[in-house]
From Swiss-Prot:
Disulfide bonds: none annotated. Its EC number is 6.3.3.1. It catalyses: 2-formamido-N(1)-(5-O-phospho-beta-D-ribosyl)acetamidine + ATP = 5-amino-1-(5-phospho-beta-D-ribosyl)imidazole + ADP + phosphate + H(+). Keywords: ATP-binding, Cytoplasm, Ligase, Nucleotide-binding, Purine biosynthesis. It comes from the Bacteria. It comes from Erythrobacter litoralis (strain HTCC2594). It is an enzyme of class 6 (ligase). One of its GO terms (molecular function) is ATP binding. This is Phosphoribosylformylglycinamidine cyclo-ligase. Pathway: Purine metabolism; IMP biosynthesis via de novo pathway; 5-amino-1-(5-phospho-D-ribosyl)imidazole from N(2)-formyl-N(1)-(5-phospho-D-ribosyl)glycinamide: step 2/2. One of its GO terms (cellular component) is cytosol.
């Protein structure tokens, strides 16, 4: 409580657990981070009631705006529990901007929402620094956000994140998947790790199996297990955008919750069925570790994790070589993982004996 010149006392917002000064200090601290993300069309100032963006200054003539929002899921809890806050902001941006590029849109600007019970220990600054880094990787401007200090809403040390992104694509150039037809080739871009889906199962395994997160991974003596688990989600925007604008890609699927099995059909028209050959790429060691630890069946892996493929492209056979070369040059690892066949809209993933630890040839399917 505070006292005025007459000696009277009264409640303050700080008495209730909200530190306005801490919030103002945070805005000041992140100012340089925000300015570092600026691009044509953005004004570079934060702290107002909203952020401005001029699509014309970004070079657009007749743009369609594409919007998306997402979070990081329970990967966030793993970061909180291990006090590793520096990369979940990259995950937040990645989950949003990768959802925009699959529609042919260039991410233009991003806003974040950070909520916690109490601002402390520089956690928010570290998280927002990661968000700014993700924005730079994606080429979009961080034009604003909301930091909410809400006593009593969260356990001590906990926080939540949400991201909001808007992109643009010139009218008529958006990716809708309607051009995909039997004969199209499916290319897969390697993921950087688990990305941001499947962490409720990961955390359950960690608890049940007693994993030592701060020790070297069983499959990699040179890196801690927690470092593998918190590897940031790969941002594919910079490498994919030139190919998208060149008209070389007919559909893109971001492999998130639901895995390969359920995400690929989201971008297919009726009459197109994706057939994925799991023998076409090597299962990442981290995925093999998760599968072995949980005794997870191949079909469950295909609908839970990205299994080493973070983005799937549908291209015509005559463009496979050029697209592969372009993406390799951009730093992507590209696998030819399947084809589109005539059939009910959906996806089949199949593998031979030994693939994904299977004891026999296997197949799993999702329709719709």
């Amino acid at each position: 409580m505070s006292a005025d010149s007459s000696g009277k006392t009264g409640y303050t917002y700080a008495d209730a657990g909200v530190d306005i000064d801490a919030g103002n200090a945070l805005v000041k601290a992140i100012g340089p981070l925000v300015k570092a993300t600026m691009r044509p069309g953005a004004d570079g100032e934060i702290g107002g009631f909203g952020g401005f963006f001029d699509p014309g200054a970004a070079g657009y003539k007749d743009p369609l705006l594409v919007a998306g929002n997402d979070g990081v899921g329970t990967k966030l809890k793993l970061a909180i529990d291990t006090q590793r806050h520096d990369t979940v902001g990259i995950d937040l941006v990645a989950m949003c901007v990768n959802d925009l590029i699959v529609q042919g849109a260039e991410p233009l600007f991003f806003l974040d929402y950070f909520a916690t019970g109490k601002l402390q220990n520089g956690v928010a600054e570290r998280v927002i620094a990661g968000i700014a880094e993700g924005c730079k990787l994606a080429g979009c401007a961080l034009i604003g956000g909301e930091t909410a200090e809400m006593p009593g809403m969260y356990a001590e040390g906990d926080y939540d994140l949400a991201g909001f992104c808007v992109g643009a694509v010139e009218r008529g150039e958006q990716l809708t998947g309607t051009k995909v037809a039997p004969g199209h080739v499916l290319l897969g871009l390697a993921s950087s790790g688990i990305h941001s889906n499947g962490y409720s199962l990961v955390r359950r395994l960690a608890a049940d199996k007693g994993w030592k997160l701060d020790r070297p991974a069983l499959f990699d003596n040179e890196r801690l297990l927690i470092e593998h688990l918190l590897e940031p989600t790969r941002i594919y925007v910079a490498s994919l955008l030139p190919a998208v604008r060149a008209g070389e890609i007919d559909a893109l699927a971001h492999i998130t919750g639901g895995g390969l099995l359920e995400n690929i059909p989201r971008v297919l028209p009726q009459g197109a069925h994706a057939v994925i050959d799991a023998d076409a790429w090597e299962q990442p060691r981290l995925m093999a570790f998760l599968q072995a630890q949980g005794g997870i069946e191949p079909g469950e892996m295909a609908r839970t994790f990205n299994c080493g493929i973070g983005m799937v492209l549908a291209v015509t056979p005559d463009k496979v070589e050029a697209v592969t070369a372009r993406l390799n040059e951009a730093g992507e690892t590209v696998h030819r993982i399947g084809t589109i066949e005539a059939g009910e809209k959906g996806c089949t993933v199949r593998g031979s004996t030994g693939t994904w630890s299977a004891t026999a040839d296997w197949e799993t399917r999702h329709l719709g």
